[in-house]
Amino acid sequence: MKKEDPNLSLFSFLDEDIICGVDEAGRGPLAGPVFAAAVILDPMRPIDGLRDSKKLTEVKRDALAIEIKQYALSWSIAQCSEEEIDSLNILQATMLAMRRAIEGLHVVPTLALIDGNRCPVTSVRSEAIIKGDDKVQAISAASILAKTARDHALGLLHIQYPHYAFDQHKGYPTALHLERLREHGVSPVHRKSYAPVRALLGGVTPANKV
């Protein structure tokens, strides 16, 4: 007799629910929007290899994102802009992006399983699952869509602002990113409420040129 996965069996009582998994990408970076995705998987069309997007190679993530969009019953990707992050704070902006993703589904779920320890305010019944992106396949799928969407967005920002090297660090506070920030100043797509960016502003008008 096959032993059940102790993590996945926690959710076996939800078989009759229409479950969407929800996850975010991009809370830590100094630039660009924060993204969230919601996915309702089709049990009749399983997708092999779903797991936490951070544990997958870029090539594998991109391939799985195509499969998810092709085989899921419904999927939705949403974001909150840098301006919204600075206005609301990153936690509230992340919750808002998650709510937008859930509301963007064309199939209405009866239960949203959220990666992490907090749930967004939404009309859908929600449960937070710590490390859910490695426990629940629908959350894994959402993490992959959110991550690939954000990486694509940062690739576009790299075209617009090539001297920041967004294609290499995706906006995260790496040594290279901080060096380019000091060299070129703060761009319109940087999160001005984040300490490393705020420290560089020091009353100086952000750079607007490419």
UniProtKB/Swiss-Prot annotation:
- Which residues make up the binding site for a divalent metal cation? D23, E24, D115
Keywords in alphabetical order: Cytoplasm, Endonuclease, Hydrolase, Manganese, Metal-binding, Nuclease
Q: Which GO terms describe its cellular component?
A: cytoplasm; ribonuclease H2 complex
- NCBIfam families in the record: PRK00015.1-3, PRK00015.1-4
The record's family statement is: Belongs to the RNase HII family.
* Cofactor (UniProt): Mn(2+); Mg(2+)
Reactions catalysed, semicolon-separated, are: Endonucleolytic cleavage to 5'-phosphomonoester
Mind listing the GO molecular function terms for this protein? manganese ion binding; RNA binding; RNA-DNA hybrid ribonuclease activity
UniProt protein name: Ribonuclease HII
Q: Does the record carry Zinc-finger as a key word?
A: no
From the UniProt record, give one GO term of the biological process aspect.
DNA replication, removal of RNA primer
Q: How is the cofactor bound?
A: Manganese or magnesium. Binds 1 divalent metal ion per monomer in the absence of substrate. May bind a second metal ion after substrate binding.
Residue ranges constituting the RNase H type-2 domain according to the UniProt record:
17-206
EC number(s) reported in the record = 3.1.26.4
